[in-house]
């Protein structure tokens, strides 16, 4: 039986500090969270960064560089996956939707990948969704995705294609067909975002069955769906992700105090089902890094 790759997404950009006092915010806190997750069984860490003074999402190269330096100083084997998600949110002005409202983060797509070009992590995310997100809209147009993918390829980084709905997978197939992205690809299904993929087994089975032959895939669930999707993904032959980007509760009403706790819970679930987690080096071989 193949081992399972566990990714830990330690902070994200939508989880807010006021939601939990345990959210990693500073570069050192984020790096320490990654190292703790690795000790608990994570083979990969998915990293966003924040402004240390406010906890708000950052796109600053120096913040990413400091986190990576702190991780590599203590753990050179851990696979680092940097986000490219920030920079795609549009908030319309009430009464004049042509005008951006506060909260809009839209920027040049090349700005969204400049840290990837500079730091060259082994993996980075590449969101393929254009969708409603609460009262806002997330926009990743095919042309912008292609511009970002070109930079990612030139940096020698593997893109992790994040899929929020079935149409995103059709875009991924087009990117492979025209040579923008190498096939069969690495995919992550994002389950439970409002107006995105549902968290029922039938949805995950359908998405898995639409993948190109030979594709590697993972899935994760948002909030209360986190641990059910751990089990569903494993049962369907996929890899898994947990972390405070996606969920801040260990159980109903009980905040997790660390990302390592979430990793440990997922590890136990996989073990109870008869599986084993892959080490970072084993994951590296499985992914062809």
Language model segments and positions:
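Conserved, mostly hydrophobic/aromatic
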Residues: 30, 37, 48, 124, ...
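Glycine-rich, proline-tolerant flexible connector loops at the mouths of alpha/beta enzymes
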Residues: 18, 43-67, 133, 190-191, ...
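Histidine-centered catalytic micro-motifs
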Residues: 8, 27-32, 42-54, 79-84
């Amino acid at each position: 039986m193949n081992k399972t790759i566990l990714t830990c997404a330690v902070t994200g950009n939508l989880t807010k500090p006021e939601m939990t006092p345990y959210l990693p915010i500073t570069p050192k806190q984020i790096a320490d969270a990654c190292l703790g997750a690795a000790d608990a069984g994570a083979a990969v860490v998915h990293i966003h960064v924040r402004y240390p003074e406010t906890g708000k999402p950052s796109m600053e190269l120096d913040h990413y560089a400091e986190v990576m330096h702190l991780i590599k100083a203590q753990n050179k084997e851990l696979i680092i996956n940097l986000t490219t998600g920030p920079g795609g949110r549009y908030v319309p002005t009430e009464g004049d939707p042509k005008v951006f409202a506060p909260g809009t983060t839209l920027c040049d797509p090349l700005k969204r990948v400049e840290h990837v070009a500079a730091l060259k992590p082994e993996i980075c995310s590449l969101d393929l969704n254009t969708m409603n997100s609460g009262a806002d809209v997330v926009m990743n147009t095919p042309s912008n995705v292609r511009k970002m993918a070109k930079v990612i390829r030139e940096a020698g980084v593997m893109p992790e294609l994040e899929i929020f709905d079935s149409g995103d997978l059709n875009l991924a197939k087009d990117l492979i067909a025209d040579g923008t992205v190498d096939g069969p690809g690495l995919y992550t299904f994002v389950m439970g975002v409002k107006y995105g993929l549902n968290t029922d087994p039938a949805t995950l089975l359908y998405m898995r069955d639409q993948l190109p032959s030979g594709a590697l895939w993972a899935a994760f669930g948002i909030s209360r769906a986190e641990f059910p999707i751990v089990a569903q993904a494993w049962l369907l032959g996929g890899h898994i992700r947990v972390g405070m980007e996606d969920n801040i509760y260990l159980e109903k009403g009980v905040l997790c105090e660390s990302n390592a706790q979430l990793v440990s819970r997922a590890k136990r679930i996989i073990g109870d089902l008869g599986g084993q987690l892959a080490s970072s080096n084993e994951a590296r071989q499985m992914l062809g890094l």
